[in-house]
């Protein structure tokens, strides 16, 4: 194939070429993953960036996203309003102590009120005064220009708003907002010099063409960070009984995203434990970033298992991206 060599030499793969490669059963997934690894190693070496999520507001949402346990369709769910500043600040210390590079503050809902943006902004200022090198990613939903400016001024480094699926498949996933609402939010953040983070959820019944379209959409959007989530079916949601993924399919998806977005931070995110299972380590041959700890309403695996996974691969935590560089051997033992 020599795909990686061709990409490093400047070749721009077309959607048609990538779809043909992705669907070719004669191309072994591990061979495709090896091509992705050449690119991953070229741009990121063997380093792995660590991220941590805090669910700062839960279950209060008017949207009908078919994958989400916090949507309006779910009656039995964990609900609480925006938590106090002190709890968010405490979470930042946990992130710092665990060698996390990016601390992600997430709120449920269509978008934040001005009061909520002020609350988050004040909190971020305090966090930055205590942990100036800890990167802050906000995920608050649809925002306006004034809110984006407040977040930037407070010290928010990155803003996450996932496209989740392809434009063509979007209305099968959610109808209470549009695909354009999501892409406009990312463009607004870029206009305010906030690093754009946008990714996908795979396994919701999308086609192979949709998967390719998602990867190219994020390339065209120029997202700095791309989280790849794998559907973790939640009872009561539209996709609660969906079973469309295998570990090898997940690996093939991650490899494809690396081939199309060779220089970007690609993160294996929600659902990796239940969908990749014993093949989780192989995903880091293409991805260079993971979430550590729990997700929004589903649990992750113990932190030490992630540290061991990184170490067992012969990889290392990317300490260049985290503030806490002390006691490295506590989390990643020398090979």
Swiss-Prot record:
CDD domains: Radical_SAM. Keywords: 2Fe-2S, 4Fe-4S, Biotin biosynthesis, Iron, Iron-sulfur, Metal-binding, S-adenosyl-L-methionine, Transferase. Its EC number is 2.8.1.6. Residues 43-269 form the Radical SAM core domain. Binds 1 [4Fe-4S] cluster. The cluster is coordinated with 3 cysteines and an exchangeable S-adenosyl-L-methionine. Belongs to the radical SAM superfamily. Biotin synthase family. Catalyzes the conversion of dethiobiotin (DTB) to biotin by the insertion of a sulfur atom into dethiobiotin via a radical-based mechanism. Homodimer. Pathway: Cofactor biosynthesis; biotin biosynthesis; biotin from 7,8-diaminononanoate: step 2/2. It is an enzyme of class 2 (transferase). This is Biotin synthase. Its cofactor is [4Fe-4S] cluster; [2Fe-2S] cluster. It catalyses: (4R,5S)-dethiobiotin + (sulfur carrier)-SH + 2 reduced [2Fe-2S]-[ferredoxin] + 2 S-adenosyl-L-methionine = (sulfur carrier)-H + biotin + 2 5'-deoxyadenosine + 2 L-methionine + 2 oxidized [2Fe-2S]-[ferredoxin].
């Amino acid at each position: 194939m020599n795909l990686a060599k061709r990409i490093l030499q400047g070749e721009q793969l077309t959607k048609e070429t990538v779809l043909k490669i992705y669907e070719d059963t004669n191309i072994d997934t591990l061979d495709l993953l090896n091509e992705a690894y050449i690119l991953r190693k070229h741009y990121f070496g063997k380093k792995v960036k660590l991220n941590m999520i805090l669910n700062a507001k839960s279950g209060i949402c008017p949207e009908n996203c078919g994958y989400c346990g916090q949507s309006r369709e779910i009656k039995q769910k964990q609900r609480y309003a925006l938590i106090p500043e002190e709890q968010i600040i405490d979470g930042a210390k946990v992130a710092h102590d665990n060698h996390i590079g990016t601390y992600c503050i997430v709120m449920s809902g269509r978008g934040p009120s001005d009061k909520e943006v002020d609350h988050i902004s004040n909190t971020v200022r305090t966090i930055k005064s205590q942990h100036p090198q800890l990167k802050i990613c906000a995920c608050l939903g649809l925002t306006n220009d004034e809110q984006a400016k407040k977040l930037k001024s407070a010290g928010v480094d990155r803003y996450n708003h996932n496209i989740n699926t392809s434009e063509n498949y979007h209305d099968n996933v959610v109808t209470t907002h549009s695909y354009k609402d999501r892409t406009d939010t990312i463009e607004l953040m870029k206009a305010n010099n906030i690093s754009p983070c946008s990714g996908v959820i795979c396994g919701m019944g999308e086609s192979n063409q949709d998967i390719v379209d998602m990867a190219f959409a994020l390339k065209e959007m120029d997202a700095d960070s791309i989280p790849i989530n794998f559907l973790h079916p939640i009872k009561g949601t539209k996709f609660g009984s969906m079973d469309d993924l295998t570990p090898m399919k997940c690996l093939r998806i991650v490899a494809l995203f690396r081939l199309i977005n060779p220089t970007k931070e690609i993160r294996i995110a929600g659902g990796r434990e239940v969908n990749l299972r014993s093949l989780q380590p192989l995903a880091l041959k293409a991805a260079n970033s993971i979430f550590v700890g729990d997700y929004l309403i589903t649990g992750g695996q113990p932190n030490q298992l992630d540290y061991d996974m990184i170490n067992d691969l012969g990889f290392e935590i990317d300490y260049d991206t985290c503030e806490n560089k002390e006691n490295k051997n506590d989390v990643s033992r020398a090979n």
